[in-house]
C-alpha cells in the first residue's frame, strides 16, 4: 500500500485480515476433516508408506541424472561478482589497431519512486434519514413531529426542549423560497440553560425557524439564547410562526434586543395575521374582552422578562394594605403568579410593604459600593397580549383614572427611592461605580454618589393608558390647549421601580389635559394641541458587555398629539385589525397598527434629569398650529432662569416605506441601521453621552437623532442665541422637524455631550416645540420593534429629598421620511453613531451580498473587476491588507511533522533547498535525513564514507549540514554543475613514460595506474599529481592491467602476469603459463582470468600465485574477456563468443553470429553484449545462448562499450556514439551533430547523467545521456587534428583522467587530471 493514503491502507489491511481469517477458518476445517480421514487410513499408510518413499527417491534420482550439463555447470559456478577490473589495453601486433575496453562501473540506480495513491473514503456510518417538510403553523406541536423539520425515524427519545447559546450572529441563511433553514446541531454546555426536562437533547436533525426557534425532529423546540441575559422559554406546546429568510440576519447584541424579544415575535405575528397561543400570565383585567376569534393573544415577552428579573415579578393579588404573604407572593416565580391572577386589586402597594422589601435588597446594594439597581420599563403595544400583566400596572392605572376629575396625580404614588422599589435588581447586571471608571475626564466625580441609568422603552403602547395630567397644570398656559381635548389616563403603564435610597423620594409625573371616560381620547382635527411626554427617570446602570449604556426607565406619562386616539388598559383585547383602522382616521401615534414597524427605545439617564431637576421648575408648554400648516416657533435658550424647563425633543423615526406594513426584525440589516459602539477616543467620559440606536428603513441618516444629538451642543451655544425650530408637514401625514441654528450650526456638529460644568453653573436650556399636522394614515403608528436609546450619564448629581416636580420634558413625535428634509436641516445628516463599520454595515450591503451570492463564478469575477476599477488607492490598499494575511499562513508549521515531511517529499531537491531558506521551522523540516536519503536514492547517489569528502566549517567551503544525505546531495549537485557549466579548472599534468604509448589505464580512489610499452607501470596520486611508484619487472611492453585495492596485476608481451604491491612497489607473484602475449585480463576477488594470443584462457589465484584452470576452445587470439565470479565470457578473432564454466573447465555456450573479429565485450550476468569489426553489436542470452537483439547503426569498428542497467553506450570508429536499450534493442540516442568527434572514438565512460568520450581528434567531449545533447568540450589538445590523440580515459564522479600522446611526436605523452570536486575538498594522500 502506498504511503500517504491511510484510508486505502486501512481498507487493505482490513481486507487482508478478512482474507486471512477466512483462510485460517478454511484451513482449520480442512485439517479437522483430514484428521478424521487420517485416523481411518493409518494402517493402509503404514503398509504402503515404505514403498512410496522408495519410489519418490528413485524418481528424484532419475530427475537429477537427467539434468543438462549446462544446468549443472551453471549451478556449480553460481557465485556472482561485480567486476571492478582495470582497463586492459593490448596493442594488436598483427593489425596495429587499438582495442578499447572499459570496465569501470558506477553504482546502480533504483527504480522510479513509487507513486502515492489516493483512495476516497466513503463515510457510510451515518444511518439517519433526513426528511424535509414544510411546517404547518396552524397545527399544534403534537402534529409537528410527523410533518415538520428533519428527523431520524429510529430515534425514540422523548421530546425535549433545549436552549442553545445563540453565538452565530454572523451566519446568514441562504435565501430560498421555502421557510426551511439549515440544520443546527449545537450542544449547549451550560446545564442551567435547559428549561424543560432533565434529559439531554437527542442527537437529531433540527430545523431552525425564522423567529429564533429550532424545531427538533421529535416535535420539541429549541429556543436560542443570547449570551447577555438569561431568558425563560415558552411552553413546548406553543406554535411559533416563522418569518422571512431576510429577517434572520445577525446584528450586534444589545440590551434592547433582550427585552424586546417577545415584542419582535408579536409584531411579526401581528403582521402575518397570526396569534400566538400561550398560557395567560397575570392578566390585567379579571374579565378581558374577547377578540375577533374569541381567543386572547398573549406575548411571550412576559415570560422572558420574568427570568431576567430573577423570576421576581409583581403578583396580581396586591391590595391597599398588603400582608406579608402578599410580599412573599411578589417574589414568587412567574409560574406561581398565574394562579393568583384572578385576585387582582386596584390599589397600589403600601409604603410599609415596600420598605420591608427594600431592607432586604439594601444589603445587596451596600456590598456593591452603594450602586443603584436597574429600573426596567416595558411599554409594548397596546394590544393586551403585549402588556406586562402585573398588579402594579393596574393599580396605578386605576389610581390615575380616579384622579381624572382633578387633573392631578399625587406624587406619593410615584416612589423614586428605595422605599418604592417593587422588584429586586437582576444579579446578572453589571454595576459600575463612576468613581472607578477608566475615563479620566470626570471633573465632578463624587464617590458617594452612584450612577443611575433609566431605560425608556418608547413602544407604540407608550400612551396605552390614558394620559395623566401634568401636576403644574401646564395646559392652562396655552389658549389653544384650553379649547382642545387632550389625553389623561392611567399613567405609569408597565412600570418596574428599582431605585436607590439616595434618589429623590418622589418624582410625580404629570401631563396636561383630561381623559375621556372610555379610556381613549379623541378630538377634532381642526383643534391644535401641544403634546409632551414627561419622564422622571432614576436608577441607571451601565452594561459592561456593550459599547452603549444599558438603561432602564420609569414613570412615563404621555400626551397624545392632535387628532390621535389613545387606547387604554381596559382595551386589552383590541386586535391589530381593529387598531389599524382606515388610512384617513386620526389616532395616537403610539397606538398599535397592523403595519408592525420597528419600535424604538429611548433610554434616559436619571442623573442627567436629576441635574435638570435641581435647576428647573415646571414651565408652560405652548403650541399652536393647524392641519397642513408649517408654523415656526422661536425659542430662546437661557442659563440664568431657575424656573426654566428643559424640553428635550426626541423625534421617533417611522419605518420607511409609506406604511406598507413591512415587518422589520432586529436582525434585518436591510431594514434598519444598527447602532455603533461608543468610542473612547471621542470623549465618552463623565460628560453626557447619548447612544442612539436607530431602526429605520428609509434613509441612512440618523435624522431623528440629529434633533437631539447634533443640533444642540448646549455647552458651546450662546445663551441668548435663538434657535429656530421649523416644523414642516410631510407626506402620509407624518410630522418632521427641521432644527436649524443659522449662526453656529456647522460649528456644533460634533460629539453629542452636555458639559457638566456648564450645567452646574446654573444654566438650563429650554426647548419648546410646537407640533401640528395630520397624524394618522397608513403606517402612522409607532410599532413594536423600533427602539431608540438615549443615555445621559453624569458622575455627580446632588441628592435631595425635597420635591422638585417635573422638570425635563421629552416630546416624542413620529417623523416621516428623512429624505424629504431640507438640505440645511440637521435631520438629514448622519450622526457619529451611524458611521458604517465591520459590525455596523450599511443597510444596502446585505442586499448587495445576497445578489453577489446568486451570481455565477464568471459574474462574480466580473463584478470584482468592476469593483476594483471604482476603488480609490486607499480602498485598494485596504483590500491588500485584508487579503495578504490569507496567503501568509504557515501551513507547513501547523501540520504534524510526519505530514509536513510527506508534503515536502513531493518537492524537487532544488525547491527543498529554497524552502529551507524560509524560516527556522522550515529549515528544520527540510533538513530531515530520511527526506534527503530518498532524494539521493532517486538520483543514484551513494553516501558511503569517503576519504575525499570536502571539509566543512572553517576549513572547508561548505556550511555544516546536520543531514548527511542532504550534504551528499548538495555536494553532488555542485559537482554536477562543475561538470556541466562552470569553468574547467586547470588540469594537473602527470608526465611520464616519455614518448611511449600509454597502453592501459586504471583509476581507483586517489590512485592512478598507467601501463606503457616501455615495459613499466607507474602509480600516480590523483590529488597532487605526483608519481608515487614505478613498477619495473616486465621484459616486454605492458598491454593489459587490473587494479583492486592495494594490488596491481599486469600482463605483458613477455607472456607473463605479475602481481604487484602498490604501497611497496614490489612484485609479489609472477604468473607463467601462457605461450604468447597476455592481451586482456579481468580481476574478480582473488581470481584473475587472462586471455592470450595463444587462444587460451587461464584462471589464476593471485594470493597463491598459481594457475587454477585452463580453458581451451577458441581458434584464434582471445581479444577480450569478462568474469563475474561464476561464468567467464571471452571474445576472439575467430568471430566467436564463448561462455565458460571455469570450475568444470568446459564451454557452456558458443555464441556464433558475428562475421568478423570480436573486439569488445560487456557482461552483467544475464546478458552478453559483443562488438565486432562487422559494425554490429549483438545481445545474447546467457542461459540459452540465443541472440536476443542485433544492434545495427554503426558504420565501423565498435572500439568501446559501457553497460549499466540495460543501458548500453557504444563508441565507434565512425566518430559516433550511440545509446541503446538492450531489452528492446532500440537506439535511444545518437551523440552526433555539429559538435561530434571528427575522428574515431577511442574510449568512453558514462554514468546516469553524462557520457564522456575521447577521440583521435584530440578532444574529450561531454554529452547528456538522457537527451543526447552535446554539453561542452572538456579537453581540446592544441595538436588535435594534427597528430594529438587521447588514447584512454577513466572517470569517476569528481575526476577525469586522460591519457594523451601522439603518433608523430606532436604531443608529449602525459596524463591529465581534471578535478570537478567541490573546492576545498581534502583527500588523504600518501
UniProtKB/Swiss-Prot annotation:
Naturally occurring in which organism (per UniProt): Drosophila melanogaster (Fruit fly)
Positions bearing Phosphoserine: 825
SMART domains for the chain: FBOX, WD40
A GO cellular-component term linked to this record: SCF ubiquitin ligase complex
Annotated Low complexity bias: 320-348, 465-486, 510-520, 528-546, 616-631
Any GO MF annotation of the entry: cyclin binding
Region called Disordered, residue ranges: 1-58, 123-187, 318-351, 399-549, 615-642, 797-843
UniProt KW keywords: Cell cycle, Nucleus, Phosphoprotein, Repeat, Ubl conjugation pathway, WD repeat
Gene3D superfamilies from the UniProt entry: 1.20.1280.50, YVTN repeat-like/Quinoprotein amine dehydrogenase (2.130.10.10)
WD repeat intervals: 992-1030, 1033-1070, 1073-1110, 1113-1150, 1153-1190, 1193-1232, 1236-1273
Protein name in UniProt: F-box/WD repeat-containing protein 7
Pathway, per record: Protein modification; protein ubiquitination
GO BP terms: branch fusion, open tracheal system; cellular response to hypoxia; DNA endoreduplication; negative regulation of cellular response to hypoxia; negative regulation of glial cell proliferation; negative regulation of growth; negative regulation of imaginal disc growth; protein ubiquitination
Disruption phenotype: RNAi-mediated knockdown in the posterior compartment of the larval wing disk increases cell size in the posterior compartment of the adult wing, resulting in an increase in the size of the posterior compartment as well as an increase in the ratio between the posterior and anterior areas. Knockdown of the gene is embryonic lethal. Neuronal-specific knockdown results in deficits in habituation learning, as demonstrated by the light-off reflex habituation assay.
Amino acid at each position: 500500500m502506498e504511503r500517504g493514503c491511510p484510508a486505502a491502507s486501512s481498507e487493505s489491511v482490513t481486507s487482508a485480515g478478512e482474507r486471512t481469517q477466512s483462510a485460517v477458518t478454511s484451513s482449520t476445517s480442512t485439517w479437522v476433516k483430514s484428521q478424521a480421514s487420517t485416523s481411518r487410513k493409518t494402517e493402509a499408510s503404514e503398509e504402503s508408506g515404505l514403498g512410496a518413499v522408495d519410489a519418490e527417491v528413485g524418481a528424484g534420482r532419475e530427475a537429477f541424472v537427467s539434468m543438462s550439463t549446462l544446468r549443472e555447470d551453471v549451478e556449480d559456478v553460481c557465485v556472482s561478482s561485480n567486476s571492478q577490473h582495470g582497463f586492459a589495453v593490448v596493442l594488436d601486433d598483427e593489425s596495429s589497431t587499438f582495442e578499447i575496453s572499459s570496465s569501470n562501473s558506477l553504482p546502480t540506480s533504483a527504480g522510479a519512486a513509487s507513486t502515492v495513491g489516493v483512495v476516497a473514503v466513503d463515510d457510510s456510518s451515518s444511518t439517519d434519514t433526513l426528511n424535509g417538510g414544510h411546517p404547518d403553523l396552524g397545527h399544534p406541536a403534537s402534529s409537528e413531529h410527523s410533518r415538520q423539520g428533519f428527523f431520524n425515524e429510529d430515534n425514540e427519545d422523548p421530546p425535549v426542549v433545549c436552549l442553545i447559546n445563540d453565538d452565530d450572529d454572523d451566519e446568514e441563511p441562504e435565501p430560498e423560497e421555502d421557510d426551511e433553514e439549515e440544520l443546527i446541531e449545537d450542544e449547549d454546555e451550560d446545564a442551567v440553560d435547559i428549561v424543560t426536562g432533565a434529559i439531554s437533547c437527542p442527537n437529531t436533525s433540527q430545523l431552525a425557524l425564522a423567529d429564533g426557534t429550532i424545531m427538533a425532529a421529535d416535535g420539541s423546540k429549541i429556543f436560542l439564547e443570547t449570551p447577555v441575559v438569561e431568558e425563560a422559554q415558552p411552553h413546548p406546546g406553543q406554535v411559533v410562526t416563522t418569518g422571512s429568510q431576510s429577517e434572520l440576519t445577525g446584528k450586534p447584541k444589545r440590551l434592547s434586543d433582550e427585552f424586546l424579544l417577545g415584542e419582535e415575535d408579536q409584531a411579526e405575528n401581528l403582521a402575518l395575521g397570526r396569534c400566538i397561543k400561550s398560557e395567560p400570565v397575570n392578566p390585567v383585567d379579571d374579565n378581558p374582552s374577547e377578540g375577533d376569534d374569541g381567543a386572547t393573544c398573549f406575548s411571550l415577552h412576559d415570560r422572558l422578562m420574568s427570568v431576567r428579573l430573577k423570576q421576581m415579578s409583581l403578583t396580581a393579588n396586591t391590595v391597599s394594605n398588603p400582608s406579608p404573604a402578599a410580599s412573599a407572593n411578589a417574589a414568587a416565580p412567574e409560574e406561581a403568579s398565574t394562579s393568583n391572577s384572578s385576585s387582582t386589586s386596584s390599589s397600589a402597594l403600601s409604603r410599609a410593604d415596600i420598605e420591608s422589601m427594600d431592607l432586604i435588597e439594601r444589603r445587596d446594594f451596600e456590598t456593591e459600593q452603594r450602586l443603584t439597581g436597574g429600573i426596567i420599563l416595558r411599554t409594548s403595544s397596546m394590544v393586551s397580549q403585549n402588556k406586562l400583566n402585573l398588579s402594579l400596572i393596574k393599580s396605578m392605572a386605576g389610581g390615575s383614572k380616579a384622579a381624572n376629575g382633578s387633573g392631578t396625580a399625587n406624587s406619593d404614588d410615584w416612589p423614586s427611592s428605595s422605599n418604592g422599589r417593587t422588584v429586586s435588581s437582576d444579579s446578572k447586571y453589571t454595576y459600575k461605580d463612576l468613581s472607578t471608571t477608566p475615563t479620566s475626564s470626570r471633573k465632578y466625580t463624587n464617590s458617594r454618589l452612584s450612577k443611575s441609568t433609566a431605560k425608556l422603552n418608547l413602544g407604540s403602547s407608550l400612551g396605552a393608558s390614558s394620559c395623566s395630567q401634568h401636576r403644574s397644570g401646564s395646559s392652562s398656559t396655552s389658549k389653544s390647549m384650553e379649547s382642545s381635548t387632550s389625553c389623561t389616563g392611567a399613567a405609569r403603564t408597565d412600570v418596574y421601580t428599582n431605585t436607590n435610597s439616595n434618589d429623590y423620594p418622589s418624582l410625580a409625573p404629570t401631563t396636561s389635559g383630561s381623559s375621556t371616560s372610555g379610556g381613549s381620547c379623541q378630538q377634532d382635527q381642526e383643534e391644535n394641541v401641544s403634546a409632551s411626554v414627561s419622564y422622571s427617570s432614576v436608577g441607571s446602570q451601565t452594561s459592561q458587555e456593550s459599547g452603549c449604556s444599558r438603561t432602564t426607565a420609569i414613570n412615563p406619562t404621555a400626551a397624545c398629539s392632535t387628532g390621535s386616539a389613545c387606547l387604554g388598559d381596559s382595551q386589552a383585547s383590541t386586535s391589530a385589525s381593529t387598531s389599524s383602522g382606515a388610512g384617513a382616521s386620526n389616532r395616537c401615534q403610539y397606538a398599535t397598527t397592523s403595519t408592525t414597524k420597528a419600535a424604538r427605545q429611548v433610554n434616559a439617564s436619571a442623573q442627567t434629569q436629576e441635574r435638570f431637576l435641581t435647576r428647573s421648575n415646571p414651565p408652560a408648554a405652548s403650541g399652536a398650529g393647524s392641519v397642513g400648516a408649517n408654523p415656526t416657533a422661536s425659542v430662546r435658550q437661557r442659563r440664568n432662569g431657575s424656573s426654566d424647563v428643559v424640553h428635550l425633543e426626541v423625534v421617533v423615526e417611522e419605518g420607511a416605506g409609506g406604511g406598507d406594513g413591512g415587518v422589520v426584525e432586529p436582525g434585518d440589516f436591510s431594514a434598519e441601521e444598527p447602532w455603533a459602539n461608543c468610542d473612547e477616543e471621542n470623549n465618552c467620559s463623565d460628560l453626557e453621552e447619548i447612544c442612539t440606536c436607530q431602526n429605520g428603513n428609509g434613509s441612512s441618516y440618523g435624522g431623528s437623532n440629529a434633533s437631539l444629538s447634533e443640533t444642540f451642543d448646549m455647552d458651546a451655544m450662546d445663551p441668548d442665541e435663538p434657535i429656530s425650530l421649523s416644523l414642516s408637514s410631510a407626506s402620509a401625514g407624518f410630522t418632521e422637524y427641521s432644527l436649524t441654528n443659522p449662526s453656529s450650526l456647522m460649528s456644533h456638529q460634533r460629539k453629542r455631550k452636555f458639559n457638566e460644568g456648564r450645567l452646574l453653573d446654573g444654566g438650563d436650556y429650554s426647548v419648546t416645540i410646537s407640533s401640528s399636522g395630520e397624524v394618522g394614515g397608513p403606517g402612522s403608528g409607532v410599532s413594536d420593534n423600533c427602539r431608540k436609546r438615549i443615555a445621559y450619564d453624569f458622575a455627580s448629581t446632588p441628592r435631595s429629598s425635597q420635591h422638585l416636580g417635573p422638570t425635563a420634558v421629552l416630546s416624542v413625535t413620529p417623523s416621516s421620511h428623512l429624505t424629504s428634509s431640507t438640505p440645511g436641516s440637521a435631520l438629514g445628516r448622519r450622526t457619529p453613531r451611524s458611521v458604517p463599520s465591520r459590525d455596523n454595515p450599511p443597510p444596502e450591503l446585505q442586499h448587495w451580498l445576497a445578489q453577489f451570492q446568486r451570481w455565477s463564478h464568471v459574474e462574480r469575477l466580473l463584478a470584482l473587476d468592476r469593483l476594483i476599477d471604482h476603488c480609490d488607492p486607499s480602498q485598494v490598499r485596504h483590500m491588500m491588507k485584508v487579503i495578504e494575511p490569507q496567503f501568509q499562513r504557515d501551513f507547513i508549521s501547523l501540520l504534524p511533522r510526519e505530514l509536513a515531511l510527506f508534503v515536502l517529499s513531493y518537492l524537487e531537491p532544488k525547491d527543498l533547498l529554497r524552502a529551507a531558506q524560509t524560516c527556522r521551522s522550515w529549515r528544520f523540516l527540510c533538513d530531515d535525513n530520511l527526506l534527503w536519503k530518498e532524494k539521493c536514492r532517486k538520483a543514484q547517489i551513494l553516501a558511503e564514507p569517503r576519504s575525499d569528502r570536502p571539509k566543512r566549517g572553517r576549513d572547508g567551503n561548505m556550511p555544516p549540514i546536520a543531514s548527511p544525505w542532504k550534504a551528499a546531495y548538495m555536494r553532488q549537485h555542485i559537482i554536477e554543475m562543475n561538470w556541466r557549466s562552470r569553468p574547467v579548472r586547470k588540469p594537473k599534468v602527470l608526465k611520464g613514460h616519455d614518448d611511449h604509448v600509454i597502453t592501459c589505464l586504471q583509476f581507483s580512489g586517489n590512485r592512478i595506474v598507467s601501463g606503457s610499452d616501455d615495459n613499466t607501470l607507474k602509480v600516480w596520486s590523483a590529488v597532487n599529481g605526483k608519481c608515487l611508484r614505478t613498477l619495473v619487472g616486465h621484459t616486454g611492453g605492458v598491454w593489459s592491467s587490473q587494479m583492486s585495492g592495494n594490488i596491481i596485476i599486469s600482463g605483458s608481451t613477455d607472456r607473463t602476469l605479475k602481481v604487484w604491491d602498490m604501497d611497496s612497489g614490489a612484485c609479489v607473484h609472477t604468473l607463467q603459463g601462457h605461450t604468447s602475449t597476455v592481451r586482456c585480463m579481468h580481476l574478480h576477488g582473488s581470481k584473475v582470468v587472462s586471455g592470450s594470443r595463444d587462444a587460451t584462457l587461464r584462471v589464476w589465484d593471485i594470493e597463491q600465485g598459481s594457475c587454477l584452470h585452463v580453458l581451451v576452445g577458441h581458434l584464434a587470439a582471445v581479444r577480450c574477456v569478462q568474469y563475474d565470479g561464476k561464468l567467464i565470457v571471452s571474445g576472439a578473432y575467430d568471430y566467436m563468443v564463448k561462455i565458460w564454466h571455469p570450475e568444470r573447465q568446459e564451454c557452456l555456450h558458443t555464441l556464433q553470429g558475428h562475421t568478423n573479429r570480436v573486439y569488445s565485450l560487456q557482461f552483467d550476468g544475464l546478458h552478453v553484449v559483443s562488438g565486432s569489426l562487422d559494425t554490429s553489436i549483438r545481445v545474447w542470452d546467457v542461459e540459452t545462448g540465443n541472440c536476443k537483439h542485433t544492434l545495427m547503426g554503426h558504420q565501423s569498428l565498435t572500439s568501446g562499450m559501457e553497460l549499466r542497467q540495460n543501458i548500453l553506450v557504444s563508441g565507434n570508429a565512425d566518430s559516433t556514439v550511440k545509446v541503446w536499450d538492450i531489452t528492446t534493442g532500440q537506439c535511444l540516442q545518437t551523440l552526433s551533430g555539429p559538435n561530434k568527434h571528427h575522428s574515431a572514438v577511442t574510449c568512453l565512460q558514462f554514468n546516469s547523467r553524462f557520457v564522456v568520450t575521447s577521440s583521435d581528434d584530440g578532444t574529450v567531449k561531454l554529452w547528456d545521456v538522457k537527451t543526447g545533447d552535446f554539453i561542452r568540450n572538456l579537453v581540446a589538445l592544441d595538436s588535435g587534428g594534427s597528430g594529438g590523440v587521447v588514447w584512454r580515459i577513466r572517470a569517476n564522479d569528481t575526476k577525469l583522467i586522460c591519457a594523451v600522446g601522439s603518433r608523430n611526436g606532436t604531443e608529449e605523452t602525459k596524463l591529465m587530471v581534471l578535478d570537478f570536486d567541490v573546492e576545498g575538498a581534502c583527500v588523504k594522500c600518501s
